[in-house]
Amino acid sequence: MFSLMASCCGWFKRWREPVRKVTLLMVGLDNAGKTATAKGIQGEYPEDVAPTVGFSKINLRQGKFEVTIFDLGGGIRIRGIWKNYYAESYGVIFVVDSSDEERMEETKEAMSEMLRHPRISGKPILVLANKQDKEGALGEADVIECLSLEKLVNEHKCLCQIEPCSAISGYGKKIDKSIKKGLYWLLHVIARDFDALNERIQKETTEQRALEEQEKQERAERVRKLREERKQNEQEQAELDGTSGLAELDPEPTNPFQPIASVIIENEGKLEREKKNQKMEKDSDGCHLKHKMEHEQIETQGQVNHNGQKNNEFGLVENYKEALTQQLKNEDETDRPSLESANGKKKTKKLRMKRNHRVEPLNIDDCAPESPTPPPPPPPVGWGTPKVTRLPKLEPLGETHHNDFYRKPLPPLAVPQRPNSDAHDVIS
């Protein structure tokens, strides 16, 4: 009677216990079978599972526990995120591929690094030696020896349980009994020291959040300093270039909801600045065009002066030539009557002194080199109409045998009778 009452009191006490929320981590190398194990525990079919990128989360109910399992990716590049989940975990499920003996050393290094972390040391560890259905899979003792598991858990004071299993052998209620047994053991250890673990996890979670907030502030401060340095460099560059392109390239974010009057004033100011810039550009273009026209005018005037000077020199030469020609004509006219009178009177010839001051007129046409006459154009080359030529009369190569060959009329043309014609018809 007393034993029945004691058992009823124990059952009533357990029934009055509140539901406890527990967070577990499922880690291991890639392709170890973590996601298949988690799906089997949840009651889903564990085959055709894709590799986990990042993490996946499953929720399930086990007795008085609401269990949340974080399935973390096991790739070498993603193992660095494991430490971000250590603070809030009550225990760890480490899945090992017992059929891959070549990666046992890598598995040992990953497990050792995890157990050395201060936020994991002292928490219970469940090791699942998965893929026992494959040929050549290591047994429980071999896995313990390859991983030096006994040494690791004693060094870091972690309660440990190893279970050989196969995640794809069943799911839901038909899940592998070793997986179910190991999960019950892990929850039992957590329930036994739940208060101490809960206090430790609350403390470590607070520290983790404070550390994350501090890192976030440090990142924001680094970003702010980088932006300030970039802004300062842009200002210095704008001052060197003589332009203030900072406001245009990286404008400060403004409130989109502004009074319409301020928006209108701002737009009018922008339009005035644009008009002013356009006017300055036009003025600069006009000054440049004016300088160019003045330069061209000066060059044209200099060319005209040069041509005028040449024309003046040529005019002086022409005037001098005309004066010399007129003087020679006058002298010839004065000399002609004297010669006629001398011939008429038949006087003795007078000796005339040779005048040295006479100047021959300058004949520009004689001085200019005669332009050579261009050679006649070559006969056109190409197709053309041939000239009409009369060919000689053809003669026979030898004497004919008949003397009366030439001019003899041809005999009449004999037309043979055709059948069925009028001439061929004969009436008897």
Curated annotation (Swiss-Prot):
Compositional bias (Pro residues): 371-381
Biased composition (Basic and acidic residues): 207-234, 267-287, 329-338, 392-407
Crosslink (Glycyl lysine isopeptide (Lys-Gly) (interchain with G-Cter in SUMO)) position: K329
Membrane-related topology note: Lipid-anchor
GO annotation, cellular component aspect: axoneme; ciliary basal body; ciliary membrane; cilium; cytosol; intercellular bridge; microtubule cytoskeleton; motile cilium
Chain sites annotated for binding GTP: 28-35, 71-75, 130-133
SUPFAM superfamilies: P-loop containing nucleoside triphosphate hydrolases
Effect of N130I: Does not affect localization to cilia
Result of changing K270R: No effect. Abolishes sumoylation
Superkingdom of origin: Eukaryota
GO molecular function: GTP binding; GTPase activity
PTM text: Sumoylation is required for PKD2 entry into cilium.
InterPro entries: Ciliary_GTPase, P-loop_NTPase, Small_GTP-bd, Small_GTPase_ARF/SAR
Consequence of changing W185G: In JBTS8; likely pathogenic; reduces cilium trafficking of INPP5E
Compartments in which it is found: Cell projection, Cilium membrane; Cell projection, Cilium; Cell membrane; Cytoplasm, Cytoskeleton
Disease: Joubert syndrome 8: A disorder presenting with cerebellar ataxia, oculomotor apraxia, hypotonia, neonatal breathing abnormalities and psychomotor delay. Neuroradiologically, it is characterized by cerebellar vermian hypoplasia/aplasia, thickened and reoriented superior cerebellar peduncles, and an abnormally large interpeduncular fossa, giving the appearance of a molar tooth on transaxial slices (molar tooth sign). Additional variable features include retinal dystrophy and renal disease.
Misc remark: Used as a ciliary marker because of its specific localization to microtubule doublets of the ciliary axoneme.
Functional description taken from the UniProt entry: Cilium-specific protein required to control the microtubule-based, ciliary axoneme structure. May act by maintaining the association between IFT subcomplexes A and B. Binds GTP but is not able to hydrolyze fit; the GTPase activity remains unclear. Required to pattern the neural tube. Involved in cerebral cortex development: required for the initial formation of a polarized radial glial scaffold, the first step in the construction of the cerebral cortex, by regulating ciliary signaling. Regulates the migration and placement of postmitotic interneurons in the developing cerebral cortex.
Subunit structure, as described in the record: Monomer. Interacts with CIMAP3. Interacts with IFT complex B components IFT46 and IFT74. Interacts with EXOC2; regulates ARL13B localization to the cilium membrane. Interacts with actin; the interaction mediates colocalization of ARL13B and microtubules.
Protein name as annotated: ADP-ribosylation factor-like protein 13B
